[in-house]
Design a protein with these regions (language model features):
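Positively charged n-region of N-terminal signal peptides that target proteins for export
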Residues: 1-4
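Hydrophobic h-region of N-terminal signal peptides that target proteins for export
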Residues: 9-18
């Protein structure tokens, strides 16, 4: 009986040792968040935030982890400087008082080895709401120059901007309330 106990204990200890979280640092040169919104119900306005930061923790064996991405809201870029300034103003994102947006998710869903979605909380303009980022693409590879594993993909969600108190033009339907957000991310194993 003792032999069986020690065999089971050793097996459990080895299984626990194999499951291990790995930290990946977001690569800002390969990570950005972009958005799309209908303008007066006709064309689509698009823009992106050029500066992001964050960390991803993955345990591929246990299929668990955490995603924490921060967006510098002052880095918004539509290609039209007056529009950028309008979006930074108190009418929209109020960047002076809310300089960052953040997504933190710890509910990861896998299909086999592929990450298919991350659920958590999105904070914009000081308001936090649940959000689920669905993977459009996801992969890990050994980076030829860095000689380290890089994981990344394209993740999409649709948010209702009024839920974050970004209300300018919603009633008048100048710009849609539902905004498609895509986060393109690559993160380097530390």
């Amino acid at each position: 009986m003792k032999k069986i106990f020690w065999a089971v204990a050793t097996l459990l200890a080895c299984a626990g040792a194999q499951a291990q979280s790995v930290v990946y640092k977001v690569d800002p040169s390969h990570t950005r968040a972009s958005w799309e919104a209908k303008h007066f119900g006709t064309s689509t306005n698009r823009g992106q935030w050029d500066k992001t930061d964050g960390e991803i923790t993955l345990d591929k064996t246990a299929k668990t982890g955490k995603v924490d991405v921060t967006i510098d809201m002052a880095s918004i870029n539509t290609g039209v400087p007056p529009f950028n300034n309008h979006l930074k103003s108190p009418a929209f994102f109020d960047v002076a008082n809310h300089p960052t947006a953040r997504f933190v998710g710890d509910k990861l869903k896998f299909d086999g080895d592929k990450l298919v979605e991350v659920s958590g909380d999105m904070t914009i303009r000081g308001k936090t709401n649940p959000a689920t980022l669905k993977a459009v693409a996801y992969n890990c590879y050994m980076h030829p120059s860095l000689k380290r594993e890089v994981c990344g993909g394209d993740f999409e969600t649709t948010i209702r901007r009024s839920a974050f108190d970004v209300n300018w033009g919603v009633v008048e339907k100048f710009t849609a309330d539902d905004i498609k957000v895509t986060i393109q991310v690559e993160a380097v194993k530390q």
